[in-house]
């Protein structure tokens, strides 16, 4: 006799007096996006089946048949031969139906002591765990590329900005290492998130657990989980681990977006600090001269997309009572797209950073504008006994004078400087010009975390060691 699963297309058909409408089938089906969970679904099912056999809940023959059938199904999926059916709603029922078709009643016994509620929660955690590991590796690749570029430019000087106004000279290497720090924290957040992802829901069943004598710890060990979810209601209903991952991913993209904004500005002909390799740029269909930094621009845009996924998942969870609700089917597309977006972005950026051409002369010329060493002149006066606020006021006056004349502080002669700063003239000597050079300015910040070239090289070495390189 044909099973209800094959007769009506739903695993619960015997309860109802009429079949599901075609519109509702399309509305509720998830198979065409959750099929990417197929291989982890098979892994989870095999671990579950092995435990059932070990606990004498199913026979050794049933286990052998399940393992044989799953091996065939896995091969069909990997070769693109598996026929996904909308009528079977999701990845779980599609695989179960195929398994039953291949091995008969043994396939029907696989779901003993299990619900799709704990099954899908397990699948998502298994899948996400692997993706977190992959993203961690991609973050390391990007960090490595940034460290390489930073080491090459430990002595390259450019203006540092606050409020997009010239502030103080810094080295380009120091600037790049700021992003290494950001992406290092992102990697830490991913590792921290992974610890909470890596808990086994299987065994929670629908919501209350199961009456079968299962061994959840054995399944957890087989699947590489650090432990089990301690409460069955929580195990099947909460997606906070997905929200936490997406929040960490949103921070990754936020840091990428900040870097992207600078890349776009630096590549602008009005700035001209860098050039991005042609393979990462596009042209214009109407303007022949254009070379557009589309990759960093798109990354800025895709950051909003990931931020939107975070808000979608937060909103998805906020109104759900315990335990499982169908709302949770909507967790997958935002989660899947977040993973895809972050992974693609990191891979591209690591390659793009390695191909950046730096233009040191343009950077240096920009650093010579905007009185970037004014703070150094104030520090010079402070070191000779003047209170900082008085030094600040004196230098501000000198800047005003130079600005009106269209010159920089370093362009003043010693006599002119003393003339413009009569109240502190006795503190100013020939050595003042050592403080007003770009090289002198950055070299003086010679402490951990500072922009001095020696500190940049030391920081790059430490960052590389943290990567295990």
Swiss-Prot record:
Keywords: Amino-acid biosynthesis, Arginine biosynthesis, Cytoplasm, Lyase. One of its GO terms (cellular component) is cytosol. The keyword Acetylation does not apply. GO terms for molecular function: argininosuccinate lyase activity. One of its GO terms (biological process) is L-arginine biosynthetic process. Pfam families: ASL_C2, Lyase_1. Its main location: cytoplasm. The keyword tRNA processing does not apply. InterPro entries: Arg_succ_lyase_C, Argininosuccinate_lyase, Fumarase/histidase_N, Fumarate_lyase_CS, Fumarate_lyase_fam, Fumarate_lyase_N, L-Aspartase-like. It is found in: Cytoplasm. It catalyses: 2-(N(omega)-L-arginino)succinate = fumarate + L-arginine. Its EC number is 4.3.2.1. Pathway: Amino-acid biosynthesis; L-arginine biosynthesis; L-arginine from L-ornithine and carbamoyl phosphate: step 3/3. HAMAP family: Arg_succ_lyase (MF_00006). Belongs to the lyase 1 family. Argininosuccinate lyase subfamily. This is Argininosuccinate lyase. The gene is argH.
């Amino acid at each position: 006799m044909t099973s209800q699963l094959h007769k009506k297309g739903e695993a619960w058909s015997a309860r109802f007096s009429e079949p599901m409408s075609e519109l509702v089938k399309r509305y509720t089906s998830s198979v065409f996006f959750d099929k990417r969970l197929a291989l982890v679904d098979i892994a989870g099912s095999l671990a579950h089946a092995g435990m059932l056999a070990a606990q004498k809940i199913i026979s050794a023959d049933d286990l052998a048949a399940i393992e044989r059938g799953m091996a065939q199904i896995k091969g069909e999926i990997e070769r693109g031969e598996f026929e996904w059916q909308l009528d079977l709603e999701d990845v779980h029922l599609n695989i179960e139906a195929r398994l039953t078709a291949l091995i008969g009643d043994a396939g029907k016994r696989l779901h003993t002591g299990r619900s799709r509620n704990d099954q899908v929660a397990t699948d998502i955690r298994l899948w996400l765990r692997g993706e977190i590991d992959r993203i961690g590796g991609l973050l390391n690749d990007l960090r490595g590329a940034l460290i390489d570029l930073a080491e090459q430019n430990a002595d390259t000087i450019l203006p540092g900005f606050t409020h997009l106004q010239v502030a103080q000279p810094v080295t380009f290497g120091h600037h790049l290492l700021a992003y290494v720090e950001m992406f290092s924290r992102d990697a830490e957040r991913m590792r921290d998130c992974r610890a909470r992802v890596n808990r086994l829901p299987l065994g929670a069943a629908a919501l209350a657990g199961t009456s079968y004598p299962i061994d959840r710890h054995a399944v957890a060990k087989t699947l590489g989980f650090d432990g089990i979810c301690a409460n069955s209601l929580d195990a099947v209903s909460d997606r906070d681990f997905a929200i936490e991952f997406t929040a960490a991913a949103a921070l990754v993209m936020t840091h990428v977006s900040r870097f992207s904004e600078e890349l776009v500005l630096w590549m602008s002909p009005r700035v001209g600090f860098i050039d991005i390799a042609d393979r990462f740029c596009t042209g214009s269909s109407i303007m022949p001269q254009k070379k557009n930094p589309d990759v960093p621009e798109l990354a800025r845009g895709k950051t909003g997309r990931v931020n939107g996924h975070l808000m979608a998942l937060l909103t998805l969870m906020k109104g759900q009572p315990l335990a499982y609700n169908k709302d949770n089917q909507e967790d997958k597309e935002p989660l899947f797209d977040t993973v895809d977006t972050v992974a693609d972005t990191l891979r591209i950026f690591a390659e793009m950073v390695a191909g950046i051409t730096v233009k040191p002369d343009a950077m240096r010329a920009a650093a010579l504008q905007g009185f970037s060493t004014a703070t150094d002149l104030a520090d010079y006066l402070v070191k000779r006994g003047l209170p900082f606020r008085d030094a600040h006021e004196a230098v501000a006056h000198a800047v005003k004078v130079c600005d009106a004349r269209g010159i920089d502080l370093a362009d003043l002669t010693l006599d002119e400087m003393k003339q413009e700063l009569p109240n502190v003239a006795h503190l100013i000597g020939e050595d003042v010009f050592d403080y007003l050079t770009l090289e002198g300015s950055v070299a003086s910040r010679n402490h951990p975390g500072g922009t001095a070239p020696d500190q940049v090289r030391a920081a790059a070495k430490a960052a590389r060691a943290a990567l295990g390189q």
